[in-house]
């Protein structure tokens, strides 16, 4: 009994997650209720503060969501979050720290979810028309925001390519290199701490530039895409899979106050700067003279994934792992219901953007 009481007390910080998540899981049975990971509850802002937030967060191409200096402590916060949480994720979900891709309405088991994460990689490559043939397949790949390197190792095995990953998290870089060694890929794959806005690579080095769910962390979206283009070789394909907010209607100057408030609460937990829309990314790519620009909304295709993440967090293994990891990870787990809400409202869009760097002028 004493042990049970102690365990119950230790789980007290997660009681709000348990209450909120049970409600949202019931409401998210529809495959249209796509999901993601983020934020703890806060009191409502006054109407005056909400108006200020509208002005501060208006996500237009000229706003801070597409061109801004990093807020103080942002990089350190991102690094700390992933230093703390990556081990928890790997212990439950494995080496791929991104969504899975599913057919609409598909029901899936845990093994299906892991296959769906691989499918996300393959669907992204197919959408970008990355060639498989020996002459044209990628030989050199950069993985920007690499996590613990799951995508890099997969691409190295698939193409025989040299893959280089960067992350703000020293823990992730170290773990990625350790996994590469375990899998016999140390000669093909390497990871280092690096800033996506100032990549430690020369111009034109890579014929595939890959960013799987890291763009949402970038305070300056234009600089982010510009750096992806800089390190791309002439003719190289650039793939960005990221979280966006919905496109604005022609009559709108910004998102609605309640939408901005929801995103702000998510940002606070996940060390995210202001969000932007898919159309913002298209405008940035066009302004950089990138070619073959394509986008798609895959929100419905990721719908089954986050209900499974939530359920795994509510297992004994998940709950005890969260408690051992630290407050940043717990706070992130507590915002999952807000991400569910954002997807259900059509506010959050799981987006792929692909483009190509022009060939060298003859």
Swiss-Prot record:
Catalytic activity: gamma-tocopherol + S-adenosyl-L-methionine = (+)-alpha-tocopherol + S-adenosyl-L-homocysteine + H(+); delta-tocotrienol + S-adenosyl-L-methionine = beta-tocotrienol + S-adenosyl-L-homocysteine + H(+); gamma-tocotrienol + S-adenosyl-L-methionine = alpha-tocotrienol + S-adenosyl-L-homocysteine + H(+); delta-tocopherol + S-adenosyl-L-methionine = beta-tocopherol + S-adenosyl-L-homocysteine + H(+)
Region entry SAM motif I, spans: 141-150
Biological-process GO terms, alphabetical: methylation; vitamin E biosynthetic process
Pathway in which this enzyme or protein is active: Cofactor biosynthesis; tocopherol biosynthesis
Pfam families: Methyltransf_11
Enzyme Commission (EC) number: 2.1.1.95
Keywords for this protein: Chloroplast, Methyltransferase, Plastid, S-adenosyl-L-methionine, Transferase, Transit peptide
Enzyme class, spelled out: transferase
Superkingdom, taxonomy of origin: Eukaryota
UniProt xrefs under PROSITE patterns: SAM_GTMT
GO CC list: chloroplast
Organelle targeting peptide span: 1-55
Region (SAM motif III): 231-240
Keyword Chloroplast: yes
CDD domains according to UniProt: AdoMet_MTases
SUPFAM superfamilies on file: S-adenosyl-L-methionine-dependent methyltransferases (SSF53335)
Statement: the UniProt record of this protein carries the keyword Transferase: yes
Annotated region (SAM motif II), positions in chain: 204-212
Major localization listed first in the record, in broad terms: plastid
Localization terms from the record: Plastid, Chloroplast
InterPro entries recorded: Methyltransf_11, MTs_g-TMT, SAM-dependent_MTases_sf
GO MF term list: methyltransferase activity; S-adenosylmethionine-dependent methyltransferase activity; tocopherol C-methyltransferase activity
Function: Involved in the synthesis of tocopherol (vitamin E). Methylates gamma- and delta-tocopherol to form beta- and alpha-tocopherol, respectively.
Family per record: Belongs to the class I-like SAM-binding methyltransferase superfamily. gTMT family.
PANTHER family tied to this protein: MAGNESIUM PROTOPORPHYRIN IX METHYLTRANSFERASE, CHLOROPLASTIC-RELATED (PTHR43591:SF81), METHYLTRANSFERASE (PTHR43591)
Protein name as it appears in the record: Probable tocopherol O-methyltransferase, chloroplastic
Organism of origin: Oryza sativa subsp. japonica
């Amino acid at each position: 009994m004493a042990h049970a009481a102690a365990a119950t007390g230790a789980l007290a910080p997660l009681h709000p997650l348990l209450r909120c998540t049970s409600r949202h899981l019931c409401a998210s049975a529809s495959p249209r209720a796509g999901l993601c990971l983020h934020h703890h509850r806060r009191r409502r802002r006054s109407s005056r503060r909400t108006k200020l937030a509208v002005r501060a967060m208006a996500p237009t191409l000229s706003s801070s969501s597409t061109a801004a200096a990093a807020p103080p402590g942002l990089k350190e916060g991102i690094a700390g979050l992933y230093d703390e949480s990556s081990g928890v994720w790997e212990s439950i979900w494995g080496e791929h720290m991104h969504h899975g891709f599913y057919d609409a309405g598909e029901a899936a088991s845990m093994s299906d979810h892991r296959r769906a994460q691989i499918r996300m990689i393959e669907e992204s490559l197919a959408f970008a028309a990355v060639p498989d043939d020996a002459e044209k397949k990628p030989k050199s790949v950069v993985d920007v925001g690499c996590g613990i390197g799951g995508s890099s190792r997969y691409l190295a095995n698939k193409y025989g390519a040299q893959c280089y990953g960067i992350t703000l998290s020293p823990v992730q870089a170290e773990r990625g290199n350790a996994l590469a060694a375990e899998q016999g890929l140390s000669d093909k794959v390497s990871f280092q701490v690096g800033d996506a806005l100032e990549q430690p690579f020369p111009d034109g080095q890579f014929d595939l530039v890959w960013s799987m769910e890291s763009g949402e962390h970038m305070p300056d979206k234009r600089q982010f895409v510009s750096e992806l283009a800089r390190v791309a070789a002439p003719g190289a394909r650039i793939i960005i899979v990221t979280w966006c907010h919905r496109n604005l209607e022609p009559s709108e100057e910004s998102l609605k106050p309640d939408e901005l408030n929801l995103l702000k609460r998510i940002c606070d937990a996940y060390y995210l700067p202001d969000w932007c829309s898919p159309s913002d990314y298209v405008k940035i790519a066009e302004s950089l003279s990138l070619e073959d620009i394509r986008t798609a909304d895959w929100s419905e295709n990721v719908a089954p994934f986050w209900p499974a993440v939530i359920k795994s967090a509510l297992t004994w293994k998940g709950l005890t792992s969260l408690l051992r990891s630290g407050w940043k990870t717990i706070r992130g787990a507590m915002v999952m219901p807000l991400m569910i809400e954002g997807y259900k409202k059509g506010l959050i869009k799981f987006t792929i953007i692909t483009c190509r760097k022009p060939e060298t002028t003859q």
